[in-house]
Regions:
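RNA substrate-binding interface of SAM-dependent RNA methyltransferases
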Residues: 113-199
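Acidic/glycine-rich phosphate/pyrophosphate-binding loops and surrounding catalytic core
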Residues: 95, 100, 104-116
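Glycine/small-residue-rich loop that forms an oxyanion/phosphate-binding "nest" at active or ligand-binding sites
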Residues: 83-97
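Structured adenosyl-cofactor binding patch, chiefly the S-adenosyl-L-methionine
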Residues: 142-143, 157-168, 225, 229-267
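Boundary-proximal intrinsically disordered activation/regulatory segments immediately upstream
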Residues: 5-8, 12-67
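Amphipathic alpha-helical repeat scaffolds
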Residues: 46, 128-135, 249-253
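Active-site/ligand-binding-proximal alpha/beta "capping" segment
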Residues: 195-247
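Short beta->alpha connector loops at strand-helix junctions that form conserved
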Residues: 83-84, 125, 151-152, 174, ...
Length: 267
């Protein structure tokens, strides 16, 4: 049995009903980008994610076990549905549901171009793996980077896999989907644009600023030739010992962490 609570100001009405097929269909559809874009919604599962995201985004629907609702009674939602674990398994993307699933409204962010020259931001050139994108957003959160600009072919920040990998960082990091070529052209001459390349200058000996744009490239191809032309400062993450044969490249998430960490170390 599932119980639905409809919130009305500070009180709620409770009705004993079975979750509708339309709600099950809606939740299932949000695994696809097409329907996330059409509805402006996304899903999140687990206590850490749901509690973090509920502090930043409007929760459209909250489905949780009675125990979870008792332990987290400060979380508000347009609609709260009480369900047991077996019911959650029917709608969960996880093998072992953690007691709560929430549907959130996607935020719409803007940015002030004049402020970009006063802080450090990230730009992602076709990072395609949702797990890598989620990791990068988590890294941005850790290093105090608020704005991440994603190319149109970068993975969707609101896919279930990406959301899960962020571990709640979406509540604090603003993701902007842009035409990256046009966006970086608009930044040209106004702030330094950094990127990592095999022929770049050693990041550990190069002078770094505490403002600018750090571009990270695609997992297999790195930064595209079109975007490379807009990079003003080429960086190299050196391998050790120098000149010795090692792995061909670093995972983009690992590389992002090393680059952001070195920038912040200079403060």
């Amino acid at each position: 049995m599932i119980i639905v609570f409809n919130w009305l100001q500070d009180s709620f009405q409770k009705t004993n009903i079975v979750i509708s097929k339309s709600k099950i269909k809606l939740i299932a559809s949000l695994s696809q980008k097409k329907f996330r874009d059409e509805t402006g919604l996304f899903i999140a599962e687990g206590t850490k994610l749901v509690t973090d995201l509920s502090s930043a985004f409007q929760c459209s629907m909250l489905i949780a076990t009675p125990q979870w609702l008792d332990e987290n009674n400060d979380i508000k939602a347009d609609e709260i549905i009480e369900a047991d674990i077996e019911e959650l398994k029917k709608i969960s993307n996880q093998k072992s549901p953690q007691g709560v699933l929430a549907v959130f409204r996607q935020p719409v962010y803007t940015y002030n171009p004049l402020e970009l020259n006063q802080k450090l931001s990230l730009a992602l050139d076709d990072v395609q793996d949702p797990g890598n994108l989620g990791t990068i957003l988590r890294i941005a959160d850790w290093f105090g980077i608020i704005d991440v600009f994603c190319s149109e072919h970068t993975a969707d920040a609101y896919s279930p896999k990406t959301v899960q990998a962020t571990m709640g960082a979406l509540a604090r990091v603003k993701v902007h989907t842009v035409n990256l070529n046009e966006f970086l052209q608009s930044c040209a001459g106004k702030l330094p644009i950094y990127g990592t390349f095999m022929d770049g200058e050693n990041i550990y000996s190069k002078t770094l600023t505490q403002h600018g744009m750090i571009v990270m490239g695609n997992e297999g191809n790195g930064i595209s030739p079109t975007i490379e032309k807009l990079v003003t400062e080429k960086l190299l993450i050196p391998n050790y010992p120098s000149g010795q044969i090692t792995s061909e490249s670093l995972n983009v998430g690992v590389a992002t962490a090393l680059v952001c960490g070195e920038f912040r170390r200079r403060t």
